[in-house]
């Protein structure tokens, strides 16, 4: 939040926070507490109300919405250029085939951040999906990543990496 407060002074573009529905108002509370000067907007309500709010994005420094509402409203967000985009609880995009993952990758932001305490639970696909949001293409296409890294690790062709992976999963 301190970072957002500082950035808002330097760049007029809005910043986007996408989080689970249960955390939307936590973000509001934290902004009020630590950066009361920030102009923030919570995008919620019915379709008409959200559409109206989204048309006002440029009046705010921080926009907060949830994964489910972003999925419903992505057509309104696609033309908006954000300064920074933060995914809170980024494990919500761990499945690269999920609507959440596909939707957030349509957003336009100068920089993207994934906030998570659980980057990977079951497979390297999960890590790839989060990295592909933050740095698109850095870990190759999903197919190439699987062929180059995931399958050899699963087949035990890279014992050193597998050891670290097992330690992380436990």
Language-model regions, residue ranges each:
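ASCE P-loop NTPase motor core, strongest for the SF2 helicase catalytic module
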Residues: 1-157, 164-170
């Amino acid at each position: 939040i301190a970072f957002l407060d500082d950035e808002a002074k330097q760049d007029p573009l809005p910043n986007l926070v996408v989080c689970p529905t249960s955390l939307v108002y936590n973000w509001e509370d934290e902004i009020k507490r630590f950066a009361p000067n920030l102009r923030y907007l919570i995008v919620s309500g019915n379709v008409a109300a959200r559409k109206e709010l989204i048309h006002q994005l440029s009046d705010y420094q921080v926009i907060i919405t949830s994964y489910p509402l972003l999925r419903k409203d992505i057509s309104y967000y696609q033309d908006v250029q954000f300064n920074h985009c933060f995914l809170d609880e980024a494990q919500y995009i761990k499945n690269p085939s999920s609507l959440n993952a596909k939707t957030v990758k349509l957003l336009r932001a100068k920089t993207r951040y994934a906030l998570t305490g659980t980057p990977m639970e079951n497979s390297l696909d999960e890590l790839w999906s989060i990295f592909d949001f933050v740095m698109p293409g850095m870990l190759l296409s999903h197919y190439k990543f699987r062929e180059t890294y995931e399958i050899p690790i699963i087949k035990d062709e890279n014992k050193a990496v597998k050891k670290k992976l097992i330690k992380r999963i436990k």
